[in-house]
């Protein structure tokens, strides 16, 4: 009986990795952790996305402004709450939303409770991606936000 049980394929575990989701579009990655930015960029590029990245709010606003003025704003902004320089992620997101109220900003943070998520959504973020995240969670979130943006455009 044990041999028969062993021959059956295992049911997918609840903690099985989320599959990667391929797509198109531009993603602005704003995070003070250099390694995390590099890994996120590598994963997203492999899945078909173009990426621009920086580690502080001032650069994020400049990059967004520049792309917005050329008519090609990022499809998704991944915004960490802790950034280098003087501005945090919430302040940076507010500045970007003042420039483009249709900006699609996803909060990435390691300290996100249900209440905190609600505050971010009220402030104009379109989603929250808790850290640490898996490659599949990253690509699924980016795909969902990028395609939702294109539908409303």
Short names for language-model regions:
Residues 1-28, 65-69, 119:
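Disordered, acidic interdomain junction associated with two-component signaling
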Residues 2-9, 143-153:
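The C-terminal output helix
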Residues 30-33, 54, 77, 108:
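Conserved sequence signature across two-component system core domains
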Residues 38-46:
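Charged docking surfaces used in two-component/phosphorelay signaling
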Residues 48-63, 129, 141:
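Short hydrophobic/Thr-rich beta-strand motif most characteristic of the beta2 strand and flanking loop
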Residues 55, 84-87:
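Hydrophobic residue at a beta-alpha junction
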Residues 80-82:
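Active-site residues of response regulator receiver
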Residues 87-99, 104-130, 136, 140:
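Alpha4 helix (beta4-alpha4-beta5 surface) of REC/receiver domains from two-component response regulators
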């Amino acid at each position: 009986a044990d041999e028969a049980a062993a021959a059956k394929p295992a049911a997918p575990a609840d903690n099985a990795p989320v599959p990667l989701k391929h797509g198109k579009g531009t993603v602005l990655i704003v995070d003070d952790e250099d390694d995390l930015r590099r890994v996120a960029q590598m994963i997203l590029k492999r899945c078909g996305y173009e990426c621009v990245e920086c580690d502080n709010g001032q650069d994020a606003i400049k990059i967004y402004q520049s792309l917005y003025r050329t008519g090609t704003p990022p499809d998704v902004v991944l915004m960490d709450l802790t950034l280098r320089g003087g501005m945090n992620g919430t302040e940076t997101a507010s500045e970007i939303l003042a420039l483009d109220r249709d900006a699609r900003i996803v909060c990435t943070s390691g300290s996100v409770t249900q209440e905190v998520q609600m505050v971010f959504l009220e402030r104009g973020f379109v989603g929250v991606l808790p850290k640490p995240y898996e490659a599949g969670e990253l690509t699924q979130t980016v795909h969902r936000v990028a395609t939702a943006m294109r539908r409303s455009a």
